[in-house]
Amino acid sequence: MSRVLWTLWVLGAVTNLSKEEAPDQSSSLSCDPTGVCDGRSRSLNSMPSGLTAAVRSLDLSNNEITYIGNSDLRDCVNLKALRLESNGINTIEEESFLSLWSLEHLDLSYNLLSNLSSSWFRPLSSLKFLNLLGNPYKSLGETPLFSQLTNLRILKVGNIYSFTEIQDKDFAGLTFLEELEIDASNLQRYEPKSLKSIQNISYLALRMKQPVLLVEIFVDLSSSLKHLELRDTHLDTFHFSEASINETHTLVKKWTFRNVKVTDRSFTGVVRLLNYVSGVLEVEFEDCTLYGLGDFDIPDVDKIKNIGQIETLTVRRLHIPHFYSFYDMSSIYSLTEDVKRITVENSKVFLVPCLLSQHLKSLEYLDLSENLMVEEYLKNSACEDAWPSLQTLVLRQNHLASLERTGETLLTLKNLTNIDISKNSFHSMPETCQWPEKMKYLNLSSTRIHSVTGCIPKTLEILDVSNNNLNLFSLNLPQLKELYISRNKLMTLPDASLLPMLLVLKISRNAITTFSKEQLDSFHTLKTLEAGGNNFICSCEFLSFTQEQQALAKVLIDWPANYLCDSPSHVRGQQVQDVRLSVSECHRTALVSGMCCALFLLILLTEVLCHRFHGLWYMRMMWAWLQAKRKPRKAPSRDVCYDAFVSYSEHDSYWVENLLVQKLEHFNPPFKLCLHKRDFIPGKWIIDNIIDSIEKSRKTIFVLSENFVKSEWCKYELDFSHFRLFDENSDAAILILLEPIEKKAIPQRFCKLRKIMNTKTYLEWPTDDAQQEGFWLNLRTAIKS
């Protein structure tokens, strides 16, 4: 019994643990408000639960889902797109898609579906895109899969290994299919007319290793197909027989051979096939390999007529293993006379034989980009009578090194108007060059040139010199309409007077820091300007111009996203249209002028106030007093030499010398007075004499009169006495009114003296002789106090 309980407990614990470790499927989805749900690469092993009608798009690709049940998508009635590619799905229940009548995009590619059921697709009446590639089915089922998909426009079916047969019912009902991709790499059986039911199909991509059934498939689609692309096919065994085709009138306009392997012999078969069906205008070879030497044995070349209708031939990345043994292809020269456009890109072309160039009589466009052309071999290719109708020549990314020689080489091309020689290493440019006289377009981008000179033809209407090392553009090109000069080192816009017809200017990613309204207005015909990606200095003038000109946004095609401030530093990286500078930054001159004016007015006001309230006097007196205080004293402060210092006007000297001195110095005991006329030290600064005399006197007697108030030196003596009153906080001043004087006559700056006159008794000289004795008694008492 205990063992049973123990076993049950262990099973319960394991079950709970597995539940805890199992991921929450619904939480593995991230959905936005529009109903787009992303569940890619979440290691899901089953369909998420809780899917509702709110889901519009569901991506569950790159997971580990193996099974889709009837109820998994039941509520997704509004689902438009369902991506389930790259899972391990091997089972889909019959009614799994029953409610997906709104579904337009379904991708079930690269799963493990070995059997396809028509019941899956029957409810999908709105389906436009269906991808079933990479599943291991052998065929498309016993019953028509797609007969109910009347709105289907793009269909992809097949696989590399197991898809071996196409039956006549497989594509029934797909009347209006636009694009079809079939991976028939291992196709072994094709029932005739299996693709015949498809009408007006635009594009068929057919992947097949061996071309055994190629002609049969082509015949069924020839009357409805416009573009056939053949992929990953080994055409080395391909042989075409005219007897295999009954209908020669086709709708096919373009053939593309992608990653196809051909030999000299099989190439002949391709040419015969293209000749036998009329209407082909364009042939394209991409990433193909030619196992041969160019020895194309084409019998009855003169009978090949329809291939002459081909107007465009494109060859990209052609690999020729025996490249250095390759012939000149002279056997097919006559087939090229009516071709108008040829592109041979990245295929190691170093020479176009002169004879071939002369046969290309209708050629208007030739692109030899990413090859090995040099001036010497280009001269042979552009020989006399070569490419007589050529208008556009593209020699981008070859090995050209001299602009002068390149231009001279092309002089034989009388109708040449457009030349692209970008991504060659010219480095320098001569002062003069010769070019075909009808030149209208020249592309010199990415050629490492440092300057542009008169080598540029004046007949140009379009010039591209972008991605070089130019720091100046000063060419006079009177007919130029478009100038592309981005990714250089220009610091300013070109001079508009040199480009009077300019319509388009692209000058982004240079060293331009600003441009003005005047500069743009000087380009009278300019319609388009692209100047983003420069390091703009967002000055007030630049911001005002760019933000206030509403019409500027119509001219600047990359505005505002690519217009960023580089300085000032606090707005670096911000879009020009969003930057706002402060008043101090935008009106600095006015601000400085205002501050200067305010400072001037402040100084002027200060001077007026100083003059009105004797401010200069206060400062002068304070300075003098401080200087005096800093000087070392000749005698200690207690060594007083005089009883009183007498301050008086020269006009009152008679009264002082004959009355005051006589009454005080001849009194017993005598008083010692200090008079400036008698006791000042000769040669000493007068202010120092005044200060020293006041400091060496116990009292200071001021003989006040109208003359005293008007005397300049008396004012100084009053001044320093005034400072002494503040400094010592004493009552050392004795005022004698020699004659009546109003208090207003004493300057208000002598506030202490005025206060003394208001609060203390002063001596007034009596005119009555009887009262004079009392005056002298009071004076002597005041001096002794």
UniProtKB/Swiss-Prot annotation:
Task: Give all residue intervals belonging to the LRRCT domain.
Answer: 525-579
| Segments on the Cytoplasmic face | 611-785
**Topological type in the membrane:** Single-pass type I membrane protein
Known SMART domains for this protein? LRR_BAC, LRR_TYP, LRRCT, TIR
Task: Tell me one GO biological process term.
Answer: innate immune response
**Record's keyword terms, sorted:** Cytoplasmic vesicle, Disulfide bond, Glycoprotein, Immunity, Inflammatory response, Innate immunity, Isopeptide bond, Leucine-rich repeat, Membrane, NAD, Receptor, Repeat, Signal, Transmembrane, Transmembrane helix, Ubl conjugation
Disulphide bonds in the chain:
31-37, 354-383, 433-455
> Any signal peptide, and if so, which residues?
1-17
| Stretches forming LRR repeats | 54-77, 78-101, 102-125, 126-150, 151-175, 176-199, 200-223, 224-250, 251-278, 279-308, 309-337, 338-361, 362-388, 389-414, 415-437, 438-457, 458-478, 479-500, 501-524
Glycyl lysine isopeptide (Lys-Gly) (interchain with G-Cter in ubiquitin), cross-linked positions: 755
**Does the keyword section mention Signal?**
yes
Instruction: List, in alphabetical order, the Gene Ontology terms for molecular function in this entry.
Output: NAD+ nucleosidase activity, cyclic ADP-ribose generating; signaling receptor activity; transmembrane signaling receptor activity; triacyl lipopeptide binding
Q: Where is this site: Interaction with bacterial lipopeptide?
A: 350
Which spans are transmembrane here? Answer: 590-610
| TIR domain ranges (all copies) | 640-783
Q: Where is this motif: ATG16L1-binding motif?
A: 762-779
Quote the subunit structure annotation.
Interacts with LY96, TLR1 and TLR6 (via extracellular domain). TLR2 seems to exist in heterodimers with either TLR1 or TLR6 before stimulation by the ligand. The heterodimers form bigger oligomers in response to their corresponding ligands as well as further heterotypic associations with other receptors such as CD14 and/or CD36. Binds MYD88 (via TIR domain). Interacts with TICAM1. Interacts with CNPY3. Interacts with ATG16L1. Interacts with PPP1R11. Interacts with TICAM2. Interacts with TIRAP.
Instruction: State the domain notes.
Output: Ester-bound lipid substrates are bound through a crevice formed between the LRR 11 and LRR 12. The ATG16L1-binding motif mediates interaction with ATG16L1.
Name the UniProt record assigns to this protein:
Toll-like receptor 2
Species annotation: Canis lupus familiaris
**Gene this protein is translated from:** TLR2
